[in-house]
């Protein structure tokens, strides 16, 4: 609260009144003045003190690696230690101020001062079991996620403090870079995750000689970027979002205000993967698959929810994402009602042979079966609430949930919002899926 003259209302309250002893007037006056003095302190009590973190990343195509420097400044003494979870085959050559302790898969850094710095090298080349890559640096471009350059970390710091972080890149000549963050006028990226006290880079990033298309769709600032000559359909992706981002925001009103979509061709992984405020999709992936679902919309559901599944419940998260990739296109008019029903028939048939849902990672047939189960959940919710509630109401709450998503959590949310127990039982998946197979045919 700004300091200034006491206003006339307060002065009037401090004047003696008939029948009020003089000592009482003085006590009232004193209490009012003390409250005015304390008010500014109270208004700042919830403001956390900040320490500054700067991440500098120098990309080197010749060695397929990056040199990373972390600088702590402005009250860096608030940070007692940072423990990084590393892969010794990927992260190496840790040096810095204070004390550094190496273990098998961790590096413990104690800055021990008002300022601190740490440097290390990281390889940007991660090959999946398929032989394709989800992180790669070439002569002309580099595609990676934030955790590929700054590993996962735990931090011990003074209570009531948080970081104020920036990210800068040093790039080869003629390269540019995109990341899922706003930029300062200096060109540095502002790293700000509201739910974290130590902000480090996350999400997909692309550097190199690239083509970029940008637009604001339904209030979301969208960037679509891909290396030149990769065959990525940037304008097609923007058009797809122009049709479907509206229905997404109706279900997920807290969708990130910025969205980055990066794309590339071979030898990158031929699929799609989400990250905070961003996603990657292979240049050859269709906007709409033959079964009527959309890889991009599927990943956007993950971006919107940021949900984690409990062990054995990955099918639930993947089923929700696949269900809505189809549902959003029905709502937007991208596909017809008949095509929508036909797609559900195809997915139900595909999932018929699945006997177990509790696999570690949901795959095609399991996810197809999960879609039918989510559809059954939606139908039961509508039936028991006379169309006042549906699966949207469940999913919105799951998006706000900070813990693991489970079937029991879904059932408890449903009971709370409807007041009744659900008949929906994923353990009886064979019976439920058979019911979902009925629909309107279309060639």
Identify the role of each PLM range.
Residues 29-30, 48-71, 401-443:
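Beta/coil-rich, acidic/histidine-enriched accessory regions frequently appended to metallopeptidases
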Residues 1-24:
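N-terminal secretory signal peptides that target proteins for export/translocation
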Residues 277-349:
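Zinc-dependent metallopeptidase catalytic helix centered on the HExxH motif
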Residues 27-39:
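Bacterial N-terminal signal peptides
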Residues 49-51, 59-60, 65-71, 82-242, ...:
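Non-catalytic architectural context of zinc metalloproteases
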Residues 335-383, 395, 409-410:
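Long, well-structured alpha-helical subdomains associated
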Residues 226-238, 282-287, 307-311, 360-364:
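Second-shell loop/turn segments in exported
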């Amino acid at each position: 609260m700004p300091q200034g003259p006491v206003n006339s209302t307060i002065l009037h309250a401090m004047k003696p009144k008939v029948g009020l002893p003089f000592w009482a007037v003085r006590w009232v006056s004193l209490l009012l003045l003390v409250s005015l003095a304390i008010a500014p302190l109270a208004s700042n009590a919830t403001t956390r003190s900040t320490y500054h973190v700067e991440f500098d990343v120098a990309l080197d195509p010749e060695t397929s690696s990056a040199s990373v420097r972390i600088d702590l400044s402005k009250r860096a003494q608030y940070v007692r230690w940072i423990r990084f979870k590393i892969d010794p085959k990927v992260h190496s050559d840790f040096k810095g101020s204070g004390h550094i302790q190496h273990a098998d898969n961790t590096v413990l850094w104690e800055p021990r001062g008002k300022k601190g710095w740490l440097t290390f090298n990281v390889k940007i080349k991660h090959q999946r079991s398929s032989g394709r890559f989800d992180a790669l640096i070439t002569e002309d471009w580099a595609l990676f996620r934030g955790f590929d350059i700054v590993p996962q970390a735990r931090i011990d710091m003074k209570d009531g403090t948080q970081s104020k972080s920036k990210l800068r890149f040093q790039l080869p000549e003629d390269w540019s870079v995109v990341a899922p963050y706003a930029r300062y006028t200096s060109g540095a990226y502002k790293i700000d995750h509201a739910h974290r006290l130590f902000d480090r880079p996350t999400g997909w990033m692309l550097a190199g000689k690239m083509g970029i298309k940008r637009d604001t769709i339904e209030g979301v600032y969208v960037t679509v970027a891909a290396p030149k000559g990769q065959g990525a359909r940037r304008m097609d992706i923007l058009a797809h979002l122009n049709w479907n981002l509206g229905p997404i925001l109706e279900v997920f009103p807290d969708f990130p205000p910025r969205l980055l979509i990066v794309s590339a061709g071979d030898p990158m992984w031929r699929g799609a993967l989400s990250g905070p405020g961003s996603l990657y999709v292979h240049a050859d992936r269709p906007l709409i698959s033959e079964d009527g679902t959309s890889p991009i919309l599927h990943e956007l559901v993950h971006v919107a929810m940021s949900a984690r599944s409990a062990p054995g419940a990955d099918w639930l998260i993947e089923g929700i994402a696949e269900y809505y990739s189809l549902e959003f296109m029905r709502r937007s008019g991208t596909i017809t009602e008949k095509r929508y029903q036909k797609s559900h028939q195809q997915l139900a048939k595909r999932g018929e042979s699945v006997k177990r849902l509790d696999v570690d990672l949901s795959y095609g047939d399991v996810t197809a079966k999960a879609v039918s189960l989510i559809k059954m959940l939606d139908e039961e919710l509508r039936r028991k609430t006379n169309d006042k509630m549906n699966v949207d109401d469940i999913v919105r709450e799951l998006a706000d949930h900070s813990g693991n998503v489970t079937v029991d959590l879904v059932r408890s949310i449903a009971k709370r919002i409807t007041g009744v127990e659900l008949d929906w039982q994923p353990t009886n998946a064979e019976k439920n899926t058979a019911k979902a197979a009925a629909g309107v045919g279309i060639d």
